[in-house]
Amino acid sequence: MSVWRPSDNKVYLPPPPVSKVVSTDEYVQRTNYFYHASSSRLLVVGHPYYSITKRPNKTSIPKVSGLQYRVFRVRLPDPNKFTLPETNLYNPETQRMVWACVGLEVGRGQPLGVGISGHPLLNKLDDTENAPTYGGGPGTDNRENVSMDYKQTQLCLVGCKPAIGEHWGKGTACTPQSNGDCPPLELKNSFIQDGDMVDVGFGALDFGALQSSKAEVPLDIVNSITKYPDYLKMSAEAYGDSMFFFLRREQMFVRHLFNRAGAIGEPVPDELYTKAANNASGRHNLGSSIYYPTPSGSMVTSDAQLFNKPYWLQQAQGHNNGICWGNQLFLTVVDTTRSTNMTLCATATSGDTYTAANFKEYLRHAEEYDVQFIFQLCKITLTVEVMSYIHNMNPNILEEWNVGVAPPPSGTLEDSYRYVQSEAIRCQAKVTTPEKKDPYSDFWFWEVNLSEKFSTDLDQFPLGRKFLLQAGLRARPKLSVGKRKASTAKSVSSAKRKKTHK
């Protein structure tokens, strides 16, 4: 007798449907109007290793290093309140205008140079590359004065939201830890802010929380967090607002090889080495196995520069193809090829002979920037589908456009007094309209306001002329040159010649 049995194989159901994210090209209509906007010369000067505080709770000289991120928050004018070249360009009842970034150039001033850093008390035990003798156990204090140059990095990243960085921080342990236990690590994400330190070759790490000796790395990062852009997270972002595109160049090699002094928290297992024959050789007690290199970025050259060149955005890496939501852009820049630290000297005590104590030495670092953009005017038709999509993406966009969603009708009867200040009724609560808070007010960016820097005369600016050239366009002639009329005698003689020829 045959009996039916269900199949033992697993049955996989289709995945549930997800809301589809579409490109901005699907609902943004581009016009033929382009604008040029540029900043003024942007300068910053400070101490390359640490900030100087001469008054309580007030920084007199900021920390300005060539190893810091420069994050420009570029403010754009509202195109819906902009003077447009045509009155019938769009319908304000059913459409809204937005900006699209189609080109940019980051100008860098100052000469190429290599900046160095160091620590007067760096945890350096032995030279493990060419050790003349076998190093013994560490003494009480083996710190030395060591300086080095850093990894070379050039970066230019553009988006309408701040770039996202990643670093390793101190995590939460599952069980209570004792003094001296290795802290757990946790990968953390945060916005990259202006002044954050880049990865210099020692890893993206929270050094202040994970290196308590304050002698493991140079001075400029000993209490800092070095961040690395989280390209994986930004590339996988649904709407692609954090990163339209990026330019990156990194290089590094190892210059010196050292090891650290201190008790080894995790000793080398016995099965990994053969013990020395006797104590006289000095190898019975193993030397420190905590090795580390000093990084170097090698030579800087103008042949490998990413800056002072125009770049054109044809297709972004994400779904946002250069649309500047919120009328703003975030430009993240790193350039360690111009990280020269300038030494200044001031006379403290005059004398006929040189005495080192008669002079005070100072360090300064200066940076110079100039940013230029080409923007394209675009319009969006506010259909029900588009408004619903934008509301799910970012409801603040519709609020800025004064497009609101009607609340559902209230099912209760509310009380409304006429004389709200009268003492005959109960005290009425003060109704205050909440102020709209800037979502990035708690973060630090370099503000660049381009609200009054827009121009349609592209041929009057260097980047505008480059844009016209690559686009195959020509500027409209400003001066009309009249043609010279032919003389009457010439016309008559020409007619006679034609008649004679016949």
UniProtKB/Swiss-Prot annotation:
Superkingdom, taxonomy of origin: Viruses
Mitochondrion in keyword set: no
Subcellular localization, as worded in the UniProt entry: Virion; Host nucleus
Primary location recorded for the protein, binned into one broad class: virion
GO MF terms held by the record: structural molecule activity
HAMAP family per record: PPV_L1
Function: Forms an icosahedral capsid with a T=7 symmetry and a 50 nm diameter. The capsid is composed of 72 pentamers linked to each other by disulfide bonds and associated with L2 proteins. Binds to heparan sulfate proteoglycans on cell surface of basal layer keratinocytes to provide initial virion attachment. This binding mediates a conformational change in the virus capsid that facilitates efficient infection. The virion enters the host cell via endocytosis. During virus trafficking, L1 protein dissociates from the viral DNA and the genomic DNA is released to the host nucleus.
Protein name, per record: Major capsid protein L1
